[in-house]
């Protein structure tokens, strides 16, 4: 348990930051889920729109230190590829 005033304050700050980070991560997951649902529905326009709204949220997660840069880059790349494949008609 924190004993000194400084360590008590640090514990409070860490708890507050953890709550903010948890909320931000949850928000990002919600945007990703919307993209996944749009891809699953098969609607290229909806998928592209959902991806367009999700990308800034994911990038914000990187700048705020919630997610790692490479993780977000990988997720964005994979989602963009899936949306692109959805919008291009399948070659027979």
Curated annotation (Swiss-Prot):
One of its GO terms (molecular function) is structural constituent of ribosome. Keywords: Ribonucleoprotein, Ribosomal protein, RNA-binding, rRNA-binding. Coiled coil: none annotated. SUPFAM superfamilies: Ribosomal protein S20. Residues 1-23 are annotated as: Disordered. GO terms for cellular component: small ribosomal subunit. Gene3D superfamilies: Ribosomal protein S20. GO terms for biological process: translation. Binds directly to 16S ribosomal RNA. Belongs to the bacterial ribosomal protein bS20 family. This is Small ribosomal subunit protein bS20. It comes from Cereibacter sphaeroides (strain ATCC 17025 / ATH 2.4.3).
